[in-house]
């Protein structure tokens, strides 16, 4: 009996039958003779199955992969080779035991411990130009969980023998894998059947060929897609798929000689919009003009150009001109005194200054009648944007001014300054165009495309009345999409209410937000404000993004870019991305943390829920360590879990968290995400705060033009005996307070003149103020609160500044001696960078750091308080108290300089054991009250409290509980505050019981009352 044999490959071993043998006689005879290279492993159809580890010789040099080959000896005269090359190049799997414990599971991201059985998926190596394969490792359970969710047509493990290396496994692992295979098969019983195996053919020379002409054996590079998501382009025709044609609908319908194109009519429209305070009325006025025109017989102007000019602050063009330069150039054109124009400019409106002096000019009078068109104005603005030399700019301005009336020129100057002063934004203008125009513009930032699609839809309606088509909202590649934003979240309960479906909690990276656009080999990077990002921050990403997204030829990514330390793997602080700062960190890389994908391979993903977008991102992106990485994100469904995360983030000194609804779509420009930062919690109790002196002021702009509305804040340096600048503060005052401060503040106008900067002030040139205080020791003290203390070399207080400053209180009870000085400011900065001993608990709405409260511990106002825990203050707390607490000042005021993350010596709360859901509220409150440390409101306050005071025992208990010191009557001279008569200590401040309760309610010291 002669021997015949059949060669199988792992994917088709069980699927093929004897009928599928392809006859040949001589080609593999050499392999059959070398029995010593084969070992018996199993039986197939009752016949012995042999395994050969070396590749079959006849396959060497062919396109087939080298792998374990199965040989079956069968009785008969025929021999055969099965499985065509298409099947042989399919996805492969292997199995072994982890050798070093360094490889991570591709699914769960955990390290696979040394000696643990693991399954590998053999995939093309995207990091090698020469091709080749690499292995993605999984835990056994993780692999089958991934296969369970894979598409029905995806290759799955159907038999143990399909795993290369299975014969080296222990029996336990074999049984475990076999059980997983059985479970997978039962769950996939209802899925579509696998496509039939393509039969291979043999040529007379023994070469394997495909019966399909031109069949390709190259593995597809298309992106992987998860079940239930079909990434197919929308062929509705609404999305911009090609460049806008040269002859647009907007310009084709325009009659340049019609008065709707005159700048005069445009000015009238702006004036009407500005005169109406109602936003709905503003929109209606613009809508009427775009539909009916100035004569009421229909609009005959250029819709796109009109809308574009109505939005100079949105569609911005750089003209390289500031207010002083404009005044300087027009003083030459009008032949008038530049100093007079500069003084008038202090009123805050450069366009009004130009109008006034244009009307007064004798040598260059305005035109008698306005005949300029908006097309001519647009051409002038385009020309001006290309000029950088003063002489050229002056000539261009002179040319256009010679044809302008005074009001025409005023309007043009406002267009140059990107502010028509209509008190209306893009939404009010675009809503007049179409109800969906604003949303479409936010998504694509392509105004011309939006206008063209609106006009196209209007044409369709004219042809087929009643068939109105809604304007689609689509992203436009290589054009920045307005980023989705986050609103402030002040409590855990508010977050749970806003995200009822659960949320993704993501670390808020302290970097710079970047929107990445890729179209083939072309890349664009846009900042949060939609401006191009500086090249040194993003230039190298073009080398790594193709590796991270091997299947993506076009995409839009939402991400954060920051500098990451290669040794520790931790991000470096905000501001280190600058050229000079980055040079100081030699062992650091600029890393892109990707947290969203809104466009991929010509498909917009904005209308997909976040959970699907995140899954899509993980399926299509490969992390490149310290270059392109996923942002850290965790799914949260319980309030206690969220509270724990907030606590951990604040304790680690990170910026905060961003919370996103798992079902939320990507809404450009909408604040539908939530951000949690320490200065939002507990009504700002965790914010960085300092008491600073008002050293100078600056003129405001717009509605605050001509008045002091921005203030230069600083502190005293005892070492140099000079005053240093800390920050510029423009927020915190309402209009009434600002109006009052114009008269209350003692200021001297110096108009940023360097020669008038006093010797006692250390200030850099960029912060020369318009006004300066004559004597800083008599200046006002304000409490300035910000997100955090930061480093800014532009300020002279040892480079310390405050990020996002605002004035939270005018400290009438303090003078320059009791304000924060430079050594104290340095201490506050150091404390703010240390880990905060702070715990967030899931309590009532608006009290994210206080949890609950028991009725017996409520003050007269009903504010929640609790008993002081019997814990000793930490060493750092004592140190801070010793450095910053001055119990007595010359005028009797208490020193209350505040630290950043906490008030000095203050612990908002200690860690408490989590309360299980379902326990009674009272029990939870008692637990929190037993473990929580009170605010140190009265630190440094020494109070004489007469025993005859009504409610004496209760006042004493609360005052001492909040870290106050009571003095006896014989020691009244050491008191800083006295309740009652001050005869024995006139220097002490006289207070009342209401003052104690007011301090407890507001959680800080208030002015004596």
Curated annotation (Swiss-Prot):
Q: Which InterPro entries match?
A: ATP-dep_DNA_ligase, BRCT_dom, BRCT_dom_sf, DNA_ligase_ATP-dep, DNA_ligase_ATP-dep_C, DNA_ligase_ATP-dep_cent, DNA_ligase_ATP-dep_CS, DNA_ligase_ATP-dep_N
Name the Gene Ontology molecular function terms of this record: ATP binding; DNA binding; DNA ligase (ATP) activity; DNA ligase activity; zinc ion binding
List the PROSITE patterns hit by this protein, alphabetically: BRCT (PS50172), DNA_LIGASE_A1 (PS00697), DNA_LIGASE_A2 (PS00333), DNA_LIGASE_A3 (PS50160), ZF_PARP_1 (PS00347), ZF_PARP_2 (PS50064)
Which portions of the sequence form the region Interaction with DNA?
277-280, 318-323, 388-391, 421-427
The main enzyme category here is: ligase
Quaternary structure annotation from Swiss-Prot or TrEMBL: Isoform 3 interacts (via BRCT domain) with the nuclear DNA-repair protein XRCC1. Interacts with POLG. Interacts with POLB.
What disease is associated with this protein?
Answer: Mitochondrial DNA depletion syndrome 20, MNGIE type: An autosomal recessive mitochondrial disorder characterized by severe gut dysmotility, muscle weakness and atrophy, neurological abnormalities including epilepsy, migraine, stroke-like episodes, learning difficulties or cognitive decline, and neurogenic bladder. Brain imaging usually shows diffuse leukoencephalopathy and may show cerebellar atrophy. Disease onset can range from infancy to the teenage years.
Q: Which family does it belong to?
A: Belongs to the ATP-dependent DNA ligase family.
Q: What is this protein called?
A: DNA ligase 3
Q: Could you tell me which species this protein originates from?
A: Homo sapiens (Human)
């Amino acid at each position: 009996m002669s021997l015949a044999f059949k060669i199988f490959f792992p994917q088709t071993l069980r699927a093929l039958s004897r009928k599928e043998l392809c006859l040949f006689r001589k080609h593999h005879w050499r392999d059959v003779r070398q029995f010593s290279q084969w070992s018996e492993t199993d039986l197939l159809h009752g016949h012995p199955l042999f395994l050969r580890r070396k590749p079959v010789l006849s396959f060497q040099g062919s396109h087939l992969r080298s792998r374990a080959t199965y040989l079956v000896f069968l009785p008969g005269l025929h021999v055969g080779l099965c499985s065509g090359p298409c099947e042989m190049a399919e996805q492969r799997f292997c199995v072994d035991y982890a050798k070093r414990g360094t490889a991570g599971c591709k699914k769960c991201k955990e390290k696979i411990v040394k000696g643990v059985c693991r399954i590998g998926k053999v995939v093309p190596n995207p990091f090698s130009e020469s091709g080749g394969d690499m292995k993605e490792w999984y835990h056994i359970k993780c692999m089958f969980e991934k296969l369970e969710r894979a598409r029905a047509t995806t290759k799955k493990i159907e038999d143990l023998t399909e795993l290369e290396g299975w014969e080296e496994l222990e029996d336990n692992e074999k049984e475990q894998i076999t059980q997983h295979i059985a479970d997978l098969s039962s769950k996939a019983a209802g899925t579509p059947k696998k496509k039939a195996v393509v039969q291979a053919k043999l040529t007379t020379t023994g070469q394997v060929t495909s019966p399909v002409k031109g069949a390709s054996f190259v593995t597809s590079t298309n992106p992987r897609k998860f079940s239930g998501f079909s990434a197919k382009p929308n062929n509705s025709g609404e999305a911009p798929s090609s460049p806008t044609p040269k002859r647009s609908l907007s310009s084709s319908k325009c009659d340049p000689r019609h008065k709707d194109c005159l700048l005069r009519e445009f000015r009238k429209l702006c004036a009407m919009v500005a005169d109406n305070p109602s936003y709905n009325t503003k929109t209606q006025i613009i809508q009427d003009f775009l539909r009916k025109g100035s004569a009421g017989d229909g609009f005959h102007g250029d819709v796109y150009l009109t809308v574009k000019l109505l939005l100079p602050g949105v569609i911005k063009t750089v003209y390289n001109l500031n207010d002083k330069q404009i005044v300087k150039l027009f003083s030459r054109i009008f032949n008038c005194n530049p100093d007079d124009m500069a003084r008038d400019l202090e009123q805050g409106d450069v366009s009004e200054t130009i109008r006034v002096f244009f009307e007064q000019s004798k040598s260059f009078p305005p035109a008698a009648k306005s005949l300029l068109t908006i097309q001519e104005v647009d051409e002038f603005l385009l020309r001006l944007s290309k000029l950088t030399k003063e002489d050229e700019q002056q000539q261009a301005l002179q040319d256009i001014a010679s044809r302008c009336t005074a009001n025409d020129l005023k309007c043009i100057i406002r267009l140059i300054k990107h502010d028509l002063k209509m008190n209306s934004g893009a939404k009010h203008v675009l809503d007049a165009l179409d109800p969906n125009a604003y949303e479409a513009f936010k998504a694509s930032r392509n105004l011309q495309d939006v206008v063209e699609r609106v006009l196209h839809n209007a044409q369709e309606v004219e042809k087929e009345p009643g068939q109105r088509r809604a304007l689609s909202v689509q992203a436009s590649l290589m054009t920045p999409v307005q980023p989705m934003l986050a609103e402030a979240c002040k409590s855990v309960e508010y977050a749970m209410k806003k995200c009822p479906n659960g949320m993704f909690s993501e670390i808020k990276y302290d970097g710079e937000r970047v929107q990445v656009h890729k179209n083939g080999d072309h890349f664009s990077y846009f900042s949060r404000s939609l401006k191009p990002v500086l090249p040194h921050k993003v230039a190298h990403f073009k080398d790594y993004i193709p590796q991270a997204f091997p299947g993506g030829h076009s995409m839009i990514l939402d991400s954060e870019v920051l500098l990451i330390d290669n040794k520790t793997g931790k991000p470096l602080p905000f501001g280190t991305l600058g050229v000079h700062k980055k040079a100081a960190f030699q062992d650091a890389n600029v890393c892109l943390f990707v947290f969203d994908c809104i466009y991929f391979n010509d498909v917009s993903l904005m209308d997909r829920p976040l959970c699907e977008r995140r899954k899509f991102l993980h399926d299509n992106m490969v992390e490149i360590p310290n270059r392109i990485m996923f942002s850290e994100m965790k799914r949260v469904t319980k309030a206690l879990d969220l509270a724990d995360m907030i606590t951990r983030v604040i304790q680690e000194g990170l910026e905060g968290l961003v919370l996103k609804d798992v079902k939320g779509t990507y809404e450009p420009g909408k604040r539908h995400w939530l951000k949690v930062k320490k200065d939002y919690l507990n009504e700002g109790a965790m914010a960085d705060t300092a008491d600073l002196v008002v050293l100078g002021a600056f003129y405001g702009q717009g509605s605050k033009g001509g008045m002091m509305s921005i203030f230069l804040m600083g502190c005293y340096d005892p070492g140099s005996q000079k005053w240093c600048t800390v920050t510029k503060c423009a927020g915190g005052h309402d209009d009434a307070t600002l109006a009052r401060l114009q008269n209350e503040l003692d200021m001297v106008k110096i108009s940023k003149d360097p020669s008038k900067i006093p010797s006692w002030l250390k200030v850099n040139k960029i912060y020369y103020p318009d006004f300066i205080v004559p004597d800083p020791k008599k200046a006002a003290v304000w409490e300035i609160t910000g997100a955090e203390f930061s480093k800014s070399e532009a300020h002279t207080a040892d480079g310390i500044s405050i990020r996002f400053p605002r004035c939270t209180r005018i400290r009438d009870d303090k003078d320059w001696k009791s304000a924060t000085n430079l050594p104290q400011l340095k201490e506050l900065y150091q404390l703010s960078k240390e880990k905060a001993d702070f715990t967030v608990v899931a309590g009532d709405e608006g009290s994210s750091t206080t949890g609950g409260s028991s009725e017996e511990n409520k003050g007269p106002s009903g504010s929640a308080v609790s008993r002081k825990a019997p814990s000793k203050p930490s060493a750092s707390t004592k140190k801070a108290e010793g450095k910053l607490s001055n119990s007595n000042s010359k005028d009797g005021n208490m020193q209350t300089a505040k630290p950043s993350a906490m008030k000095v010596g203050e612990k908002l709360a200690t860690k408490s054991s989590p309360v299980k859901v379902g326990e009674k509220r009272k029990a939870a409150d008692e637990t929190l009250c037993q473990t929580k440390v009170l605010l140190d409101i009265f630190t440094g306050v020494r109070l004489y409290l007469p025993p005859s005071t009504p409610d004496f025992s209760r006042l004493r208990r609360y005052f001492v509980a909040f870290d106050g010191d009571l003095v006896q009557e014989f020691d009244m001279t050491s008191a800083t505050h006295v309740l009652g008569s001050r005869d024995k200590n006139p220097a002490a401040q006289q207070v009342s019981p209401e003052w104690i309760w007011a301090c407890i309610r507001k959680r800080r010291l208030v002015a004596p009352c």
